[in-house]
Amino acid sequence: MLPKSLVAARKLLEEITPLQTDCGLVCGGACCQTHPGEETGMLLFPGEAEMYRGEEGFTLVDSPHGTILVCEGHCSRANRPLACRMFPLVMLLRPDGVKIATDAAAQAVCPLARQGKSALSQDFVAAVRQAANLLAQDDQQAAHLRRLTDMQDELKALRAQYRGRKEHV
């Protein structure tokens, strides 16, 4: 059974999308494409893995950061994990509260991510923020948000290192 906070967060992002239209039309659904030899997927929130265990079209892969869901590139919106529903954004949990940022990893595949949050529907951004606030109230989900924050900080630091400057989310 999914944690209540996760059920509520998923519900908030069930219908709303980054653009008023299908953003996959902009890039050919680049975020849902897999490439031979690569096991790319989405990091699941605590409790989500059970939804996909044994489901056709989905593979669960353990990683040092948690469970990654790899799909075949097509699924119904109702079956998408929370990370897909909020893509290309990421929820961060800083000492001063919840923050919403463009996922540093998304910039490699998503033209909207390269544009930043201002290119997205502000209703979508607000819904992601509301979902993050719900998750931050749950200890297990808050710990996951802190891990996501650390991962984003590492990606930003690595990028800054190669650009020769210090950068923060």
Task: Give names to the regions the model predicted.
Residues 1-169:
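Short loop/turn segments that flank or connect secondary-structure elements
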